[in-house]
Amino acid sequence: MSNYTLKFYIIKSILSKKIPFLILLSFLIGNCSTSKTKQLNSSEYKLLLSSEKFDDPLTGFKNYWKIVKTVAKNHGIKVIEKEQTFDLKHKEISFFDTENLALRKAGFLIRQKVKYKKGQKKPGFEYGVKYRRTDPANALAVDLILHDGYTPKDETIELESDVVYFSRNNGSAETTYSVSNSTLLDEAPEMRLGSFADIYPALGKLGIPETAPLTKVAGVSADEWMVVPGKLDFGDGLFGRVDMTVWIIPTRDGELRIP
């Protein structure tokens, strides 16, 4: 059975108070093993939304969920709503790179996630590495399988496409392809390239010194608030889970918080 994941990301810009909002649609075509697959098994479609729609995240979630349900009804798609429709989940999201962003320039990113429970950070860390390119064959050229002794969070090293639409630019679109792999750790590694190369051998082949320190990109972390209000039934065993997420991060003018 295939799965369809619909995600809504609202991302606050680091550099200004003009906050872009990102709606992300992910289509999971199928499953694969822990080995790398050449099949495109995930596609994400992204649209920019107005920040004014989400001054209050929960209100924005509820209003946008109404829109999703209306559109689904108009297209004959059944909506399966969760009993706890707007149960908020909270995480801290951080990205790490070298001082001169050597990983980004090489097409890589390192992401750290820490979960919260009742306002307190839970023990443990989730680390993910993603490699992105504009051509799927180039994305598949990198092997993100973990070193012996580390266990992947998922059984899949996914090839996915990200499609970003620019409605103000003659409706043009930009597509990138990526592979990614994540693992759960009890302790955070030492923040240098070599520590992560010990987990992801591919990072040790970039020509970046193993001693190169890794720091948070832009020096900030994002507070992520997410709800999973339900899923869509497209028929023939095809279901879509809907995630709606707000990221809140500091800006040049101080930290902006959504009430």
Task: Annotate each PLM feature.
Residues 20-28:
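Bacterial N-terminal signal peptides
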Residues 6-20:
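Bacterial N-terminal signal peptides that target proteins for export
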Residues 35-259:
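Phosphate-end processing signature that detects enzymes handling 5′-triphosphorylated RNA
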